[in-house]
């Protein structure tokens, strides 16, 4: 992950090739983003079943995960934000989620005790989902690397906001 310091802002170096790979795959993914987003979250819970307990709307719910409307909405929001942030990374030179959103994400992730292991599970699920959803001849080590780096930048931006209230 290449970072370039500029005053107090941290600029991201994301290559033209990486951007092209992310944009090409995102163009395919966003056509069915609601269903893909749900599969992404179901994969998270498959890898880490206890993760579902981190979501208040899933605790004590009798609704199957794949039919839970709140999970569908949340999954869509997370998936689209992650993919859009990745798609804008090179052009913007930084993660382009609004500051208020980053602050809220940081506070929420801190409140629920989200740690590095959780972010790694989500990263695994994201990369695996993208691999499954793009045409087989499109997926490559370079595409995996591009998405991985983009995700790492988003997580770094969220972690910067994961500070206890003073």
From Swiss-Prot:
CC cofactor: heme b
Subcellular location: Cytoplasm; Nucleus
One MF annotation (Gene Ontology) recorded for this entry: oxygen binding
GO BP field: response to nitrate; response to nitric oxide; response to nitrite
Domain of life: Eukaryota
Induction behaviour: By flooding and etiolating but not by oxidative, nitrosative or hormonal stresses. Strong, rapid and transient induction by nitrate NO(3)(-), nitrite NO(2)(-) and nitric oxide (NO) donors, such as S-nitroso-N-acetylpenicillamine (SNAP) and sodium nitroprusside (SNP).
Signal peptide (from-to): none
Binding site for heme b: 56, 70, 74, 104, 108-109
Record motif Homodimerization, residues: 46-50, 116-128
Note describing how the cofactor binds: Binds 1 heme group per subunit.
Single GO cellular component term: cytoplasm
Function of the protein: Phytoglobin that reduces nitrite to nitric oxide under anoxic conditions (e.g. during flooding or in waterlogged soil). May not function as an oxygen storage or transport protein. Has an unusually high affinity for O(2) through a hexacoordinate heme iron because of a very low dissociation constant.
Subunit structure, interactors included: Homodimer.
Protein name as catalogued: Anaerobic nitrite reductase NSHB1
Species name: Oryza sativa subsp. japonica
């Amino acid at each position: 992950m290449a970072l370039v310091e500029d005053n107090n802002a941290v600029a991201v170096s994301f290559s033209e090739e990486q951007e092209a790979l992310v944009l090409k795959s995102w163009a395919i993914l966003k056509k069915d983003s609601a269903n893909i987003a749900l599969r992404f979250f179901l994969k998270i819970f498959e890898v880490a079943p206890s993760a579902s307990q981190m979501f208040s709307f899933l605790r004590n719910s009798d609704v199957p995960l794949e039919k839970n409307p709140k999970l569908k909405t949340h999954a869509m929001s997370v998936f689209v934000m992650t993919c859009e942030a990745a798609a804008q990374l090179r052009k913007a030179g930084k993660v382009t989620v609004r500051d208020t959103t980053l602050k809220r994400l940081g506070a929420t992730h801190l409140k629920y005790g989200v740690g590095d292991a959780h972010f790694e599970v989500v990263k695994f699920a994201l990369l695996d989902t993208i691999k499954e959803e793009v045409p087989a001849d499109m997926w490559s080590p370079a595409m995996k690397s591009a998405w991985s780096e983009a995700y790492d930048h988003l997580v770094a931006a969220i972690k910067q906001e994961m500070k206890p209230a003073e």
